[in-house]
């Protein structure tokens, strides 16, 4: 496979209609998706939902105005506890899920049944410079796509159509939206959104942007921009784990190491393991926190 083919397998493509105030984004992730699903043995229903949320995160990150990270989460109280996907302005992504691994999950189990009651959708913006912003709303809708449409109607008050799909081979998404502060004939918007709704889940997962946009809009073709390529990359590091341990405090961390000999932290996304033994922990806190936990006199370490 040549580099162009690889790139187009993991790309977000912007488009806009010159004759009406409507913009759109198409995303298809293939190699990135393969890398993510290899990290865990996801049940089929959860794998599908995670792929849809991943595609949604890449779509929504297309509207990032500043450098940073967009995080989308779905949290529930059923068999599925959490789905999370992250997309950065550097065009890297990662995603994972947490669920009750003792529960039986049917391949066709619905998102609502997986999440149980009182689910929430969380969208977080973490700019490289500045304070993070977070929005939390109750889950509304029977699918991730419908949930996002409801969220965007509430937050942006813009007519939006979102379609999401995930298969074993790829995750895909399509977003079509009115431009803000522009007048659009209702019949024109209805025409565009109706065409967008004819796209099947199979087509969305299988076809690249060129074929999707021709399939939908060949009679009134939009202006299409150069694809933006994405790759899978985890942002975990030993330094970030150290910061987390410092936040927990020397008493708690020292107690764990005194009892177990070390403390191990696994990354939920890429499964990297970070192990801190007695020497590591004492150096991190600048004192013999493990010794204190064992009942020895407190003293600093170099």
UniProtKB/Swiss-Prot annotation:
InterPro entries: Heat_shock_Hsp33, Heat_shock_Hsp33_C, Heat_shock_Hsp33_N, Hsp33_helix_hairpin_bin_dom_sf. Gene3D superfamilies: helix hairpin bin, Hsp33 domain, HSP33 redox switch-like. Disulfide bonds join 234-236, 267-270. Keywords: Chaperone, Cytoplasm, Disulfide bond, Redox-active center, Zinc. GO terms for cellular component: cytoplasm. Under oxidizing conditions two disulfide bonds are formed involving the reactive cysteines. Under reducing conditions zinc is bound to the reactive cysteines and the protein is inactive. It is found in: Cytoplasm. Its main location: cytoplasm. GO terms for molecular function: protein folding chaperone; unfolded protein binding. SUPFAM superfamilies: Hsp33 domain (SSF64397), HSP33 redox switch-like (SSF118352). One of its GO terms (biological process) is protein refolding. Pfam families: HSP33 (PF01430). Redox regulated molecular chaperone. Protects both thermally unfolding and oxidatively damaged proteins from irreversible aggregation. Plays an important role in the bacterial defense system toward oxidative stress. Belongs to the HSP33 family. This is 33 kDa chaperonin. It comes from Neisseria gonorrhoeae (strain ATCC 700825 / FA 1090). The lineage of its organism: Bacteria, Pseudomonadati, Pseudomonadota, Betaproteobacteria, Neisseriales. The gene is hslO.
